[in-house]
């Protein structure tokens, strides 16, 4: 290892790399440690979606800030590859009046914070998504600013190119600001930030983070455009979109790693949703399966901030690390370097679990 850095960041996913970027922007020397390399974990398989439609104030604000960063990422990260953002929109469908009422509450909050989402009638959802069957649709929530990146990995690589990333497995985090390595020895620093996703509780066992599997099915590229916005049905636990290269992506959001379940069961659930909602996709084969892992907390909210004297954490994102990473990077960097405590840290701190201050995020996909 090289000379002693000011800060060690454990984890070279998009969250850890964003933290390293913002720390360096504030003049800190930073070493990023990861046992497998840049974007080798969940960041490497996430499909690149970004949205501002959330059900809690803190996530709406973080997502809004992150979207502004990503809009300028080409310049900020000195990118040589266009990540290819497509503002196709996210459409959330409601199939009951109670679900629609919750969507109205979410949209009211989002509008208050400057997010241009709106409630749609069933007929309006059908106009937005040609071919959508609305017999079971009570309404929807929509924002045209949401979308996805064709090449999300280019953003992760751009963050990584600006960081000092070293291959190394961390086996222990010391309260005094050091990490112990599997290869032997320690790396000393003034502060340590753990952004290791599902690996975080191995290093910080006091944190209630658990792994939860997610499964994405992909078709081969299709020339015909069959589905432009991303369509999510929380009640049917289903989501689908067509990517820029023509592949159709579909997810059975109820497939949570049940060892008794079979791939054919998950495909059957997706086929059932296609038949009821998107019949134009019924005959699209989905031969490719990608498995990812969410790092999940009891309230499906991230854990951010200081957890020990010289140790900070940014983990437990339930699949939205990519969506929030730029804002999280700024917040953690300000806390570590300047001692500034962003409002998000007061609601996403680790102490909320023991104190009963849980704030469930209802809009997890």
Task: Say what each PLM segment does.
Residues 21-25, 50, 81-86, 196-309:
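Active-site substrate-recognition segment that forms the wall
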Residues 24-44:
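Glycine-rich FAD pyrophosphate-binding loop
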Residues 142-177, 181, 190:
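Helical element adjacent to the flavin cofactor pocket in flavoenzyme catalytic cores
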Residues 61, 93-102, 142-158, 261-266:
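Short beta-strand to alpha-helix junction loop
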Residues 278-365:
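C-terminal catalytic lobe of FAD-dependent flavoproteins
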Residues 47-128, 237, 257-259, 274-275:
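Dinucleotide-binding Rossmann-like beta1-alpha1 core, especially the glycine-rich loop
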Residues 7-31:
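N-terminal Rossmann-like FAD-binding beta1-loop-alpha1 element of flavoenzymes
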Residues 3-5, 182-191:
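Core beta-strand elements of the Rossmann-like FAD/NAD(P) dinucleotide-binding domain
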């Amino acid at each position: 290892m090289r000379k002693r850095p000011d800060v060690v960041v454990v984890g070279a996913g998009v969250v850890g790399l964003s933290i390293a970027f913002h720390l360096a922007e504030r003049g800190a020397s930073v070493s990023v440690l990861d046992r497998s390399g840049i974007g080798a974990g969940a960041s490497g398989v996430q499909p690149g979606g970004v949205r501002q439609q959330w059900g809690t104030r803190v996530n709406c604000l973080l997502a809004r800030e992150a979207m502004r960063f990503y809009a300028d990422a080409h310049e900020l990260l000195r990118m040589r590859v266009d990540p290819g953002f497509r503002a196709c929109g996210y459409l959330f469908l409601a199939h009951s009046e109670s679900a629609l009422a919750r969507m109205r509450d979410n949209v009211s909050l989002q509008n208050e914070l400057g997010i241009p989402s709106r409630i749609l009638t069933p007929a309006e959802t059908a106009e937005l998504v040609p071919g959508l069957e609305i017999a079971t649709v009570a309404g929807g929530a929509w924002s045209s600013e949401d979308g996805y990146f064709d090449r999300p990995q280019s953003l992760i690589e751009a963050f990584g190119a600006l960081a000092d990333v070293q291959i190394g497995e961390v086996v222990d985090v010391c309260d005094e600001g050091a990490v112990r390595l599997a290869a032997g020895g320690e790396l000393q620093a003034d502060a340590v930030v753990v952004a290791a996703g599902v690996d975080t509780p191995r290093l910080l066992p006091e944190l209630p983070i658990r792994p939860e599997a997610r499964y994405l099915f992909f078709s081969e590229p299709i020339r015909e455009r069959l589905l432009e916005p991303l369509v999510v049905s929380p009640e049917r636990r289903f989501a689908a979109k067509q990517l820029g290269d023509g592949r159709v992506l579909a997810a059975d959001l109820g497939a949570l790693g049940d060892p008794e379940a079979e791939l054919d069961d998950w495909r059957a659930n997706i086929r059932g949703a296609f038949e009821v909602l998107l019949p134009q996709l019924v005959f699209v084969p989905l031969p490719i399966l990608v498995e990812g892992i969410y790092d999940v907390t009891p309230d499906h909210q991230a854990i951010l901030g200081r957890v020990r004297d010289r140790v900070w954490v940014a983990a437990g994102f339930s699949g939205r690390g990519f969506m929030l990473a730029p804002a999280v990077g700024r917040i953690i960097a300000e806390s570590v370097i300047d001692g500034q405590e962003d409002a998000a840290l007061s609601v996403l701190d680790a102490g909320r679990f023991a104190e009963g201050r849980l704030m469930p995020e209802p809009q997890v996909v």
